[in-house]
């Protein structure tokens, strides 16, 4: 699973996920399913935000290529992926500027057009069950909830899906592709079932122990199918700024 995650997701997403797990004392090499789940959630948050802007009148527009007009600003503020201190600083700044109620839990995004925080969910289960769990945890009508599943289903507060149909379809397609590729590698069942994941981990650890006298052959090639998974959605104009903002610690 770890190899799949590192090949499947944008390096910046992987780096952010590793940083988030280490902040809570978790090891991406051991808790590989959680590693995959965090990367998936991060990517959905970025895809939700990318290419969406607001103009000087506060109207929402989509710009998919080229340099956006200087008067445009990103419609969504990405909060997910930042360290907790910085994330709360961003939330507090938004609340002080807009007068919006401060959320009890850190949200994933802030929508400048609708003046609301958004909680994004990505589930391997039924969307309505996960939606209710999120709603019961947040207990705030001010935070908008939007849930996506790997089967193409979605659910949002008051059936308000925020984004246009094409943008949401892009997210659903990506999730469905991840599921298919996991399944083709025998990873999907363990991703859905934690008990199966533990058994798979023990099996993997045993397989990593080389037999005495046996030659070891390692392939570093990427399959043609996996190449289709490489995310093309990243807004190149924004990537550098995000990296500087989210990843302040230089690589060693």
Curated annotation (Swiss-Prot):
A Pfam family the protein falls into: Flu_PA
GO BP annotations listed: viral RNA genome replication; viral translational frameshifting
A GO MF label: RNA binding
Catalytic-site annotation from UniProt: 80, 108
Site label Important for efficient shutoff activity, positions: 202-203, 206
Protein location: Host cytoplasm; Host nucleus
Coiled-coil features, chain-numbered ranges: none
Keywords per UniProt: Decay of host mRNAs by virus, Eukaryotic host gene expression shutoff by virus, Host cytoplasm, Host gene expression shutoff by virus, Host mRNA suppression by virus, Host nucleus, Host-virus interaction
Residues annotated as site: Important for efficient shutoff activity and nuclear localization: 195, 198-199
Physiological role: Plays a major role in the shutoff of the host protein expression by cleaving mRNAs probably via an endonuclease activity. This host shutoff allows the virus to escape from the host antiviral response. Hijacks host RNA splicing machinery to selectively target host RNAs containing introns for destruction. This may explain the preferential degradation of RNAs that have undergone co- or post-transcriptional processing.
Family: Belongs to the influenza viruses PA-X family.
Domain comment (free text): The probable endonuclease active site in the N-terminus and the basic amino acid cluster in the C-terminus are important for the shutoff activity. The C-terminus acts as a nuclear localization signal. The C-terminus is recruited to host protein complexes involved in nuclear Pol II RNA processing.
Descriptive protein name: Protein PA-X
Natural source organism: Influenza A virus (strain A/Seal/Massachusetts/1/1980 H7N7)
Lineage: Viruses, Riboviria, Orthornavirae, Negarnaviricota, Polyploviricotina
């Amino acid at each position: 699973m770890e190899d799949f995650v590192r090949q499947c997701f944008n390096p910046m997403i992987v780096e952010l996920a590793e940083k988030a797990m280490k902040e809570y004392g978790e090891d991406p090499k051991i808790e590989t399913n959680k590693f995959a789940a965090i990367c998936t959630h991060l990517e959905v948050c970025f895809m939700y935000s990318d290419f969406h802007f607001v103009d000087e009148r506060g109207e929402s527009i989509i710009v998919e290529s080229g340099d956006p007009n200087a008067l445009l600003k990103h419609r969504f503020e990405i909060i997910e992926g930042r360290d907790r201190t910085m994330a709360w600083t961003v939330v507090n700044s938004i609340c002080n500027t807009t007068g919006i109620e401060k959320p009890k839990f850190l949200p994933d995004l802030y929508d400048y057009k609708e003046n609301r925080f958004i909680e994004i969910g990505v589930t391997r289960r039924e969307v309505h069950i996960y939606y209710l769990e999120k709603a019961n945890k947040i207990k705030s009508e001010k935070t908008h909830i939007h849930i996506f599943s790997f089967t193409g289903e979605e659910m949002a507060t008051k059936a308000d899906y925020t984004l246009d149909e094409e943008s949401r379809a892009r997210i659903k397609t990506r999730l469905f592709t991840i599921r298919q590729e996991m399944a083709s590698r025998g990873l999907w069942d363990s991703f859905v079932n934690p008990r199966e994941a533990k058994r798979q981990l023990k099996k993997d650890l045993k397989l990593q122990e080389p037999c005495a006298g046996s030659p070891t052959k390692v392939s570093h090639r990427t399959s043609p199918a996996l190449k289709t998974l490489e995310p093309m959605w990243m807004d190149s104009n924004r990537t550098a700024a995000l990296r500087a903002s989210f990843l302040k610690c230089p690589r060693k």
